[in-house]
A protein has these predicted regions:
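DPxDG-like acidic metal-binding loop motif
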Residues: 125-146
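A glycine-rich phosphate/pyrophosphate-binding beta-strand-loop-alpha-helix module
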Residues: 122
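Single, functionally critical "micro-switch" positions that shape active/binding sites
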Residues: 128, 172, 308
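Short Gly/Ser/Thr- and Asp/Glu-enriched loop/turn motifs at secondary-structure junctions
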Residues: 309-314
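A general secondary-structure junction signal
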Residues: 110-114
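Residues at or immediately flanking beta-strands
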Residues: 105-107
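C-terminal nucleotide
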Residues: 1-17, 22, 30-102, 116-119, ...
């Protein structure tokens, strides 16, 4: 008997505003974008699991679950401890523990190719681990007959993601993948109470955006750990910067929610300047030379710019308020060494489809 294959996918994210300050309770703006992690799961009729994770530079794994739901690798699995593999196993451990390990054996396939440069193989920084977490949790719960609501999916995914990454990060990328569309996000008071964590927003009329890749990948973990050290060693200075960032982020969220594109464009460079203060205080490079060069190109073309996410490398986003400037920005960037990314926002209702084949 052939069992049906369950398929789902989860979006990446593009952070528009609120990086770093979101860790201290500030609101952030984030969009779900059309780069997808695809997950397929199919019952195999046995008690063992086979897992293939394309694009993650790791071998196929064979495992079973013990009574607590913990992954036990088969003796012939060519596994050595590696962050991507460890993270993936922790996510599976989390889901399996919810069912006390009583999950029938299956073949699981994961494809995160959308999140990597096709030529260099470098990661863009569009939230691949969050998308993987959301898609895998959605698929495994569907496999067990549980169709999670968006709120339940977010709650489960943020717990699993933090288990896999040592409680690092705000969860903003998980929120984008689970919710879809454009959202204003604040870190929930607890993983059990997410009632006020997400507000949905409509994209303002007359606001245009362009996404660009710096050409290099950055380590969000490294950046966050340096900021955390600054928080511990210079708490007063740290909180003075965070307070400014929070105030600017709140202004930006209000402008975005009210459809005031002009005000939002004033907020973006103000936030960038606070990121400059933060990087100088922490000894990190948020606005790397590549980000600075892109910023100069965008400003000369009439727009505003900031890194999207932790900075250092990865992605940046340019904004403007008219189509002519939007085209000028794109033309100028096409003549630069940097890669334009054709990203579109995925509406909430289209972000997490389930299909049976």
């Amino acid at each position: 008997m052939k069992h049906p294959r369950i398929s789902t996918k989860a979006t990446g994210k593009l952070i528009l505003l609120g990086e770093y300050a979101v860790l201290e309770g500030a609101p952030s703006l984030v969009a779900a974008i059309d780069r997808f992690c695809h997950v397929h799961i199919q019952k195999n009729g046995f008690s063992i699991f086979g897992l293939e994770a394309m694009n993650l530079d790791m071998p196929d794994l064979t495992f079973h679950l013990d009574e607590s739901g913990k992954v036990i690798l088969a003796g012939n699995s060519p596994y050595t401890s590696e962050k991507r593999t460890d993270f993936l196993i922790e996510v599976i451990n989390y889901v399996a523990s919810r069912y006390e390990g009583k999950i029938p054996g299956a073949y699981i396939s994961i494809d995160t190719g959308d999140f990597f440069h096709r030529t260099s193989g470098n990661k863009f920084g569009l939230g691949s681990s969050a998308a993987l977490t959301v898609a895998l949790i959605r698929a495994m719960n569907e496999y067990m007959g549980r169709n999670l609501s968006a709120d339940a999916l977010f709650s489960e995914a943020i717990k699993a993601h933090r288990a896999g990454q040592g409680r690092l990060g705000s969860g903003v990328d998980i929120a984008a993948s689970a919710a879809g569309g454009v959202i204003e996000y604040v870190v929930p008071g607890s993983e059990e109470d997410i009632t006020n964590a997400i507000k949905r927003h409509k994209w303002p009329d007359g606001l245009y955006f362009t996404s660009v890749w710096t050409g290099t990948s950055a380590s969000t973990r490294f950046m966050l750990e340096k900021v955390k050290r600054f928080r511990l060693t210079s708490p007063d200075f740290y909180h003075s910067i965070m307070d400014e960032m929070r105030s600017i982020a709140e202004d930006g969220c209000r402008a975005f929610a009210s459809g005031d594109a002009g005000k939002f464009l004033e907020v973006v460079p103000a936030y960038l300047e606070q990121e400059r203060k933060l990087e100088a205080a922490c000894g990190i490079e948020i606005i790397s030379p590549s980000h600075q060069k892109i910023n100069d190109i965008v400003r000369n073309a009439g727009g505003v710019y900031k890194p999207s996410g932790a900075g250092g490398g990865d992605i940046g986003v340019a904004f403007c308020d008219n189509e002519e400037t939007h085209l000028n920005i794109q033309s100028a960037l096409q003549d630069s060494p940097y890669d334009l990314l054709d990203l579109a926002i995925v509406p909430a209702e289209k972000g997490l489809p389930i299909s049976y084949e």
